[in-house]
Curated annotation (Swiss-Prot):
Belongs to the KRTAP type 3 family. InterPro entries: Keratin_matx (IPR007659). Residues 3-59 are annotated as: 3 X 5 AA repeats of C-C-X(3). This is Keratin-associated protein 3-2. It comes from Ovis aries. One of its GO terms (cellular component) is keratin filament.
Length: 98
């Protein structure tokens, strides 16, 4: 994930799309995993921008990752509107290319 193209997001729309949310706002582009290794995973966004200032500072918050269209219940999420999209020119999943 560290070699993702700047400002490209690896989130794919569809039944396998994952959403990772937190109480922190990442000001630059992030790459999110397109699949979850477990039903519920604790993940944090990976910033893919080559920004001089880190857009994410580790904290004690607990991010949540869940698989859309899965039968597994999502913990503590209600009344949240989520929209996923693929940025122009970023149709392919980010792949390490070092």
């Amino acid at each position: 994930m560290a070699c993702c193209a700047p400002r490209c997001c690896s989130v794919r729309t569809g039944p396998a799309t994952t959403i990772c949310s937190s109480d922190k706002f990442c000001r630059c582009g992030v790459c999110l995993p397109s699949t979850c290794p477990h039903d519920i995973s604790l993940l944090q966004p990976t910033c893919c921008d080559n920004s001089p200032v880190p857009c994410y500072v580790p904290d004690t918050y607990v991010p949540t990752c869940f698989l859309l269209n899965s039968s597994h219940p999502t913990p503590g999420l209600s009344g949240i509107n989520l929209t996923t999209f693929i940025q122009p020119g970023c149709e392919n999943v980010c792949e390490p290319r070092c």
